[in-house]
């Protein structure tokens, strides 16, 4: 006889454990358990059947894998948490005795320090794994770097996040690893490629953030504590991989005066220092290390060899011309008009990296200096100036500098009379650079709006300046990660290039019909008001006549006569009526339906807008427009052809085709809706 299984020893009851059981098993508090799970990357699980997973009658809401909790039993942080718990008891005991000094001494000297280095190495065995998990870390750290300091967000945490983020930005600038950027409602998206891994993160706009109380900053602070350690490891590895010293030199005074990126100074590892480090190591064979003079002699010989090779490899002018022609990017064009668009080769990374290298930019004080400076420097610009109000670290604070080739402005063009006058005698502490009147144009300089920088970066080339001039209507700013699909709406193209045949004419006909129906509705409302007034007058006359019945045209007697005439026509009492009925059956059916709708509307007390009393609207509704009729016939023909083709398919392929057709239909309807909206806007603009 088989042994009876004990309940709760196998299946879901064994694989899952509740949060209360896990906390009791680890012997730590619930907040420490949350922190430990965040550090180790352990999150709750959802069993298929909560009743089977729970060993009690009351179903629990939070479950974890039993093997994950068993794995946490060997974590060194548990000892730190228990030491912190014991220290808290000692501090509480000292405060209970009134010994505040002893409590402060215990907190200062005996507080356990928590390090997360081993957890970072454990969770990310390779550097590529750390890069793949860097998206959320960058988004959260950039968020905290822009938050105001509160009791929940101390200034020390904000300063640490800002320093790590600026160090990461300096690496992107030094290696030209930034690829795309997009301005959205949530903030600014950036995408960089590091060692073949695409990293996408979000940076909020620098508005005044209102910190609310419904956000649990303790949980977010735990993530920040782990992500700062992770980003510190990543920055160290990135800097050392390109031969830079980490951490870079940081000038706190410049940072206090708003230098931001300019407060950091990057330094490369010197060859002499590396040789000294190598020479100071003990030799295994007992020989002494080489002296510095010998190392310098070797380095001098290597430098001479490199100079000779570079001198011999210098090409002539003709060779350069040939290489330029060879390296030119070919453009692949389709021969057939209906062929697919061939993917075109793009510029190399070096050309895109030096996109703004030959320009000198000046950022006006109303433009966002931080993201613009980062983008311009990441794509090769070495000379970026801005107004002195925006902080230190600029190439120039003089707006009249003749070396400036592009000025980024984000202000509307105002008349000269609306501008305030400049102070003639600037007070003490004013800027030494001469002030320029707002709206003044300097000769030999391009004035552009900030979107020009983002669009040039996403397109990988310099765009036209006149489209982004101050006060001009900007082109649509599209996401660089969304590719235009065939048949979809593309705001960069004109309506004539993407609309179907006769789409504009059909929409014009629909608009005309809507206008006619609105006019007919207004006329019907007026007639209803007039009839109500006439009925009120007749009721007054009836009351004056003593309640006598008065024959009114269009009363029930006429309706009865019309019903009798219809009955006679059905019986065939009159040959002439039968001939009329055979010739105009459709007209009678339409009139009968219209009459029925009129009666229903009258009984409900609503105006009937389908007819104006003379029958002209019914004729208009019956008569279709030629373009709409032609389009409907074409659609019907295409649908019939498609149904014939579907008959030859299997059931599986037919279902797949139906899904594809349904999704394509939804996309076409959405694109047509957007084109219609744009057409109305353009027509309204032309009408003005």
From Swiss-Prot:
Keyword Ribonucleoprotein: no
Domain of life, per lineage: Eukaryota
Keywords: Coiled coil, Nucleus, Ribosome biogenesis, rRNA processing
Domain BRCT: 351-470
A GO cellular component annotation in the UniProt record: PeBoW complex
Similarity comment: Belongs to the pescadillo family.
Assembly and oligomerization: Component of the NOP7 complex, composed of ERB1, NOP7 and YTM1. The complex is held together by ERB1, which interacts with NOP7 via its N-terminal domain and with YTM1 via a high-affinity interaction between the seven-bladed beta-propeller domains of the 2 proteins. The NOP7 complex associates with the 66S pre-ribosome.
Name of this protein: Pescadillo homolog
Organism this protein belongs to: Coccidioides immitis (strain RS)
């Amino acid at each position: 006889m088989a042994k009876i299984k004990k309940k709760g020893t196998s299946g879901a009851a064994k694989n899952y454990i509740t949060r209360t059981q896990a906390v009791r098993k680890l012997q730590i508090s619930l907040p420490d358990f949350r922190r430990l799970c965040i550090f180790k990357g352990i999150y709750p699980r959802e069993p298929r059947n909560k009743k089977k997973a729970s060993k009690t009658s009351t179903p629990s809401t939070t479950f974890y894998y039993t093997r994950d909790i068993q794995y946490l039993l060997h974590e060194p942080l548990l000892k730190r948490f228990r030491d912190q718990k014991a220290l808290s008891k000692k501090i509480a005991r000292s405060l209970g005795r009134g010994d505040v000094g002893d409590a402060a001494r215990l907190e200062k000297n005996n507080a356990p320090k928590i390090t997360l280095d081993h957890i970072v190495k454990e969770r990310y065995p390779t550097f590529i794994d750390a890069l793949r998990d860097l998206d959320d870390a960058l988004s959260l750290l950039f968020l905290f770097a822009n938050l105001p300091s509160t009791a929940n967000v101390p200034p020390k945490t904000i300063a640490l996040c800002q320093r790590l983020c600026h160090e990461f930005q300096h690496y992107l600038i030094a290696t030209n690893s930034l690829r795309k950027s997009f301005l959205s409602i949530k903030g600014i998206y950036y995408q960089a490629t590091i060692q073949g891994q695409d990293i996408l993160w979000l940076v909020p706009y620098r508005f005044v953030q209102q910190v609310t109380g419904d956000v649990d900053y303790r949980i977010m602070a735990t993530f920040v504590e782990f992500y700062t350690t992770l980003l510190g490891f990543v920055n160290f590895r990135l800097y050392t991989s390109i031969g830079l010293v980490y951490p870079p030199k940081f000038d706190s005074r410049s940072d206090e005066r708003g230098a931001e990126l300019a407060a950091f100074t990057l330094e490369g590892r010197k060859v002499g220092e590396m040789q000294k480090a190598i020479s100071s190591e003990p030799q295994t064979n007992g020989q002494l290390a080489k002296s510095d003079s010998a190392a310098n002699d070797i380095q001098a010989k290597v430098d001479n060899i490199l100079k000779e090779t570079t001198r011999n490899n210098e090409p002539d002018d003709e060779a350069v011309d040939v290489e330029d022609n060879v390296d030119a990017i070919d453009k692949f064009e389709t021969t057939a008009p209906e062929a697919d668009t061939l993917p075109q080769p793009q510029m190399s990374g070096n050309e895109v990296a030096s996109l703004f290298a030959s320009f000198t930019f000046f950022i006006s004080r109303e433009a966002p200096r931080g993201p613009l400076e980062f983008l311009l420097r990441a794509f090769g610009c070495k000379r970026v100036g801005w107004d002195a109000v925006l902080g230190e670290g600029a190439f120039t604070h003089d707006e009249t500098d003749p070396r400036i080739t592009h000025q980024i402005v984000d202000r509307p063009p105002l008349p000269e009379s609306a501008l305030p006058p400049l102070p003639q005698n600037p007070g003490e502490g004013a800027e030494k650079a001469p002030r320029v009147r707002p709206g003044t144009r300097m000769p030999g300089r391009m004035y552009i709006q900030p979107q020009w920088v983002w669009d040039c970066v996403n397109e990988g080339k310099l765009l036209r300046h006149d489209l982004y001039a101050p006060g001009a209507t900007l082109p649509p700013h599209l996401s660089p990660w969304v590719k235009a699909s065939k048949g979809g709406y593309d705001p960069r193209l004109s309506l004539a290039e993407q609309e179907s045949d006769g789409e504009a004419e059909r929409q014009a006909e629909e608009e005309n019909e809507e206008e006619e129906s609105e006019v007919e509705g207004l006329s019907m409302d007026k007639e209803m008001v007039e009839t109500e007034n006439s009925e009120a007058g007749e009721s007054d006359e009836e009351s004056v006549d003593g309640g006598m019945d008065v024959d009114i045209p269009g009363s029930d007697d006429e309706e009865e006569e019309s019903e009798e005439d219809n009955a006679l026509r059905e019986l065939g009492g009159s040959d002439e009526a039968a001939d009329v009925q055979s010739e105009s059956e459709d007209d009678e059916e339409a009139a009968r339906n219209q009459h029925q709708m009129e009666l229903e509307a009258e009984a409900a007390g609503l105006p009937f807008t389908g007819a104006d009393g003379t029958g002209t609207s019914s004729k208009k509704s019956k008569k279709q427009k030629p373009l709409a009729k032609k389009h409907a016939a074409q659609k019907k023909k295409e649908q019939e052809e498609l149904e014939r083709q579907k008959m030859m398919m299997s059931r599986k392929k037919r279902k797949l085709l139906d899904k594809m057709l349904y999704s394509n239909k939804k996309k076409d309807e959405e694109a047509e809706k957007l084109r219609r909206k744009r057409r109305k806007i353009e027509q309204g603009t032309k009408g003005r």
